[in-house]
Curated annotation (Swiss-Prot):
Its main location: cytoplasm. Residues 549-602 are annotated as: Sigma-70 factor domain-4. InterPro entries: RNA_pol_sigma-70_dom, RNA_pol_sigma70, RNA_pol_sigma70_r1_2, RNA_pol_sigma70_r2, RNA_pol_sigma70_r3, RNA_pol_sigma70_r4, RNA_pol_sigma_70_non-ess, RNA_pol_sigma_70_r1_1. It comes from Pseudomonas protegens (strain DSM 19095 / LMG 27888 / CFBP 6595 / CHA0). The gene is rpoD. This is RNA polymerase sigma factor RpoD.
Length: 615
């Protein structure tokens, strides 16, 4: 029997035993595992898979009562299938430790999307966003904020695309691709380091792309309708209150008009944060009340969760608890002022927002459901297009970033593409996403690949210079001079020289040299600041000769010369400083110095130093 078959047989036996006795112990699992699996994380993964099959794994054998809760299942076919799956996973785990291969393996389990699948996911994303917008519309102040932002950009000369991204109309048809231009992308940064695509990128930059944002006329109609309905809703709320049927109908009509408006992420997140902020304040006070009741007053948690909902701002609720006959009534009475203080903060929140506590929770619940729906759909779209990122990232290897870093940056661009994808344009998602992925990768290379960061605009200039330099090399058969490059690029010569200097890549001094790699680049570079051994030896000999000559003078004369010329000292000294040291006048020091120098000039003493002077 082969090793793999024997391994599968042992795993089958393990699973069958687990199904028969209703459990397994860690010791039994360990005995049946292959010897090459020793990593704790791998063992945990296998135990998790066994648990997923309905077999509990315990430290030791459980008692009989616990076993009665589990039903034994001895299906032979199921045991064989589970053993085969477990063996395959174990083999895979044992072999693969490379993160790239593990990533590729996980990526390969997701099927590619068809055009219909992309549209279906895009519609689910839009539906989730519509639900969020519909919930947000019921929160006071959100619609007014967006209307004020729209008024600001239209009256102060701002860009409509700073507020509005588009519209989400489920009934709109899909435009044929021929009727549309390719999806707009900020291509100024998408061409930073791709020599083969420089010309195309620069052509795109030269044609200053007109902003293809929302149509101002349609935006005026939509926001005008929302503003009119907002005014009607405000009057109905003021006249009848939020619980009146007419007011509810007007609010639903406002939400229907507000839902199709697709805001830019910054504005959308701002509205969501408004709702979350109110809910966070609400939760904070609810937690404080629960701690007072459950932790401090020893009220059973189940009792609190049953009685508190609906009584968040009812101060008589604590009176009833305090006057009750429960064990915790006395403690509640003692803590009643603190509980009422928290309830008053909740009441202030209701007054501030104009909503009841239950309404704030309901708005947040509907908003969270819509966000979760959109998030799940976006996750599906991203996972189904990870292969596209790999195919694009492969073209940018060996440019200063690791392959996994390129994949990561490309995935960030892919997520941006999912956020901005408009299936109604008629293009497949891959056509649209390619530009965003390439933009993210090239921008990251420009920002991160070099040890010394160079701005993106300078990277573009360097790439253009390199391309023109190669063209001129082919035309002339030699490297062009800076003057010739400046003439071709219509740039001053000094700027060309500056760009050429900036374009140089730094290299490590520890770069190995030679086949054996036993020496480094730094070993071959001259250190101009280092003194040669001969100079060092000469200086040391001069010091010794000077000390020997000075030893032939009197102690006073030698010290005066040492201080005046800074010999064996940090610095030299003036006549006045030396005079203070000896407590004599500066004239006397000058005389001592002159006498000492005359002695040193005598041939018997000066011959020791004259050889150094000749050198």
């Amino acid at each position: 029997m082969s090793g793999k078959a024997q391994q599968q047989s042992r795993l089958k036996e393990l699973i069958s035993r687990g199904r028969e006795q209703g459990y397994l112990t860690y010791a039994e699992v360990n005995d049946h595992l292959p010897e090459d699996i020793s990593d704790p994380e791998q063992v945990e993964d296998i135990i998790r898979m066994i648990n997923d099959m309905g077999i509990n794994v315990f430290e030791s054998a459980p008692d009989a009562d616990a076993l009665l809760l589990a039903e034994a299942d001895t299906d032979e076919a199921a045991a064989e299938e589970a053993a085969a799956a477990l063996a395959a996973v174990e083999t895979d785990i044992g072999r693969t430790t490379d993160p790239v291969r593990m990533y590729m393996r996980e990526m390969g389990t997701v099927e590619l999307l068809t055009r219909e699948g992309e549209i279906e996911i895009a519609k689910r994303i839009e539906e989730g966003i519509r639900e969020v917008m519909g919930a947000i519309a019921h929160f006071p102040g959100t619609v007014d904020h967006i209307l004020s932002e729209y008024t600001r950009v239209t009256t102060e000369g701002g860009r409509l695309s700073d507020v509005l991204s588009g519209y989400i109309d489920p009934d709109d048809g899909i435009t044929p691709p021929a009727a549309e231009v390719p999806p707009p992308v900020d291509t100024k940064t998408a061409k930073a380091d791709d020599d083969s695509e420089d010309e195309e990128a620069e052509a795109t930059e030269d044609e200053e792309e007109a902003e293809s944002g929302p149509d101002p006329v349609i935006a005026a109609q939509r926001f005008g309708a929302v503003a009119d309905q907002m005014e009607v809703t405000r009057k109905a709320l003021k006249k009848h209150g939020r619980e009146n049927k007419q007011a509810i109908a007007e609010m639903l009509a406002l939400a229907e008009l507000f839902m199709p408006i697709k805001l830019v992420p910054k504005q959308f997140e701002g509205l969501v944060e408004r709702v979350r902020s109110a809910l966070d304040r609400l939760r904070q006070q609810e937690r404080a009340i629960m701690q007072l009741c459950v932790r401090d007053a020893r009220m059973p948690r189940a009792d609190f969760l049953r009685q508190f909902p609906g009584n968040e701002v009812d101060e008589s609720w604590t009176d009833a608890l305090a006057k009750g006959k429960s064990k915790y009534a006395e403690a509640i009475a003692r803590l009643q002022p603190d509980i009422i203080r928290c309830q008053q903060k909740l009441t202030a929140l209701e007054v501030e927002t104009g909503l009841k506590i239950a309404e704030i929770k309901d708005i947040n619940r509907r908003m969270s459901i819509g966000e979760a729906k959109a998030r799940r759909a976006k996750k599906e779209m991203v996972e189904a297009n990870l292969r596209l990122v790999i195919s694009i990232a492969k073209k940018y290897t060996n440019r200063g970033l690791q392959f996994l870093d390129l994949i990561q940056e490309g995935n960030i661009g892919l997520m941006k593409a999912v956020d901005k994808f408009e299936y109604r344009r008629g293009y497949k998602f891959s056509t649209y996403a390619t530009w965003w992925i390439r933009q993210a990768i090239t921008r990251s290379i420009a920002d991160q690949a070099r040890t010394i960061r160079i701005p993106v605009h300078m990277i573009e200039t360097i790439n253009k210079l390199n391309r023109i330099s190669r063209q001129m090399l082919q035309e002339m058969g030699r490297e062009p001079t800076p003057e010739e490059l400046g003439e071709r690029m219509e740039m001053p010569e000094d700027k060309i020289r500056k760009v050429l200097k900036i374009a140089k890549e730094p290299i490590s001094m520890e770069t190995p040299i030679g086949d054996d790699e036993d020496s480094h680049l730094g070993d071959f570079i001259e250190d101009s600041t280092m003194q040669s051994p001969i100079d060092v030896a000469t200086v040391e000999s001069l010091k010794e000769a000077t000390r020997e000559v000075l030893s032939g003078l009197t102690a006073r004369e030698a010290k005066v010369l040492r201080m005046r010329f800074g010999i064996d000292m940090n610095t030299d000294h003036t006549l006045e400083e030396v005079g203070k040291q000896f407590d004599v006048t500066r004239e006397r020091i000058r005389q001592i110095e002159a006498k000492a120098l005359r002695k040193l000039r005598h041939p018997t003493r000066s011959e020791h130093l004259r050889s150094f002077l000749d050198e």
